[in-house]
Amino acid sequence: MIETDTITTLTLPTIPVMLNTTEQRADYLARHYWDNVNFADSNYIHHPEVTEQGWVNFIDILQLVPASTADIALKTLLTQAEKEKKCYMYLTSLADKYLYDPNSPMRNEELYISVLDAMLKSPILDDTEKIRPKARRSLAQKNRIGTKALDFTYTLANGKQGTLYALKAPYTLLFINNPGCHACNETIKALKQSPTVSQAIAQHKVKVLSLYPDIDLAEWQKHLSDFPSDWINGYDKKQMIDQKNLYDLKAIPTLYLLDKDKTVLLKDATAEEIEEYLQKNI
């Protein structure tokens, strides 16, 4: 074990001069970012100004490279960190904080999946320590970008019912929300004020399904007037989404953009990201 704490900075790798495009340099930096860190030295966990800030910068770089490179970079990092369990657990806690926490502006499920996959294969964790990552990995796989969204039944205020799969439109915008929540109201406002979204709805290119997943029906009914009349506004009468863990409800509101076959195009997106996608594709 290394006793003397001499850590003051994170030494980044020197990028070879022959790599002269932004893409090449970002790719190299992502793959070799942690090469100069000796993860056998647990003193790194006591220096958030070095290690945590280094992690934040690393995640920023991963946004600039292909998904396959980001996946390799994260898994390589965690393999390197297996030299010292304290360092390993510290890095996975940073992944929880920045990539998984619903309040993190850097939240990124695809990157977090890479971390979870590494944890599940790691010899440094025992079976008990793998229970939580296994459950999170299972939930993350549901409604993942590129997969088909899970079907469910919704109920309207008049008692009529429908299913997600029965909605016919080039695009479906699924908006899971709670009535009266501030972030939900902000999202409703942003979608209502978007000319792109409004026009797409008017032209029947997009159907919006607003879904309330909880049990306080009186509260939901009280806020029905908050929603545009051309949205489908339903609730989950039998609480199937919650009980069967069909959708990840830790972050409310949640927006999913689906294609005509209900394949997920955008997951946990912002109203701005939805608008931008529709502008480019409609």
Each model region followed by its residue ranges:
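Short loop/turn microsegments at loop-to-beta-strand junctions
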Residues: 150, 172, 252-253
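Short, internal strand/loop/helix patches
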Residues: 221-256, 260
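Short active-site neighborhood of thiol/selenol oxidoreductases, capturing the structured segment around
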Residues: 162-191, 207-211
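Non-catalytic, surface beta->alpha helical segment in thiol-disulfide oxidoreductase systems
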Residues: 251-254, 260-282
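Short acidic-hydrophobic, aromatic-tinged amphipathic segments that line or gate anion-handling sites
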Residues: 155, 232-236, 268
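Structural microenvironment flanking redox-active thiols in thiol-disulfide oxidoreductases
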Residues: 185-225, 239-243
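Oxidative protein folding and maturation machinery
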Residues: 1-160
